[in-house]
């Protein structure tokens, strides 16, 4: 097989992989929520098709900062994340819960299927002061 044919085949495979990545849409609910200090909150992540619990992750993005890992593999806290955060779910339905909201939790939260894939639509948590 000559080089041109190899390059074309590689490009076709790459396009197929990239297009298949976009098939599963993650929709988060609610889009915006407000909570008082100490309140328990739960936000959801719904997938258009089933996601393995080993590959569902949550990120926290504070204003002006990059997203930071929060929970990996559905329910495992990332290093340094407080125990008030927890994750659960399976199949097409996942959730992130904060058992007692603190002021520093004011951020946007994103779910993600597989590392490197697009984030879900996001939930912005606003803290009532």
Curated annotation (Swiss-Prot):
Residues 23-45 are annotated as: Framework-1. SUPFAM superfamilies: Immunoglobulin (SSF48726). One of its GO terms (biological process) is immune response. Transmembrane segments: none annotated. Keywords: Adaptive immunity, Disulfide bond, Immunity, Immunoglobulin, Signal. GO terms for cellular component: immunoglobulin complex. Disulfide bonds join 45-111. Residues 73-79 are annotated as: Complementarity-determining-2. Residues 112-118 are annotated as: Complementarity-determining-3. Residues 80-111 are annotated as: Framework-3. Residues 1-22 form the signal peptide. It holds the Pfam family V-set. This protein, in which there is a deletion of two amino acids at the V-J recombination site (after position 118), is synthesized but not secreted in cells that express and secrete the normal kappa chain S107. It comes from the Eukaryota. Residues 119-128 are annotated as: Framework-4. Residues 46-57 are annotated as: Complementarity-determining-1. This is Ig kappa chain V-IV region S107B. The keyword 4Fe-4S does not apply. Residues 58-72 are annotated as: Framework-2.
């Amino acid at each position: 097989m000559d080089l041109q044919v190899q390059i074309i085949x590689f490009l076709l495979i790459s396009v197929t992989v990239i297009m298949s990545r976009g098939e599963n849409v993650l929709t988060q609910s609610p889009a915006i929520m407000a909570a008082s200090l100490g309140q328990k909150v739960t936000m959801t992540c719904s997938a258009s098709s089933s996601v393995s619990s080993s590959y569902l992750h949550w990120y926290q993005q504070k204003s002006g900062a990059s997203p930071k890992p929060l929970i990996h593999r559905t329910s495992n806290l990332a290093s340094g994340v407080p125990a008030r955060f927890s994750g659960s779910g399976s199949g097409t339905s996942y959730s992130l819960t904060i058992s007692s909201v603190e002021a520093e939790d004011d951020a946007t939260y994103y779910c993600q299927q597989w590392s490197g894939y697009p984030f879900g639509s996001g939930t912005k948590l606003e803290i009532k002061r």
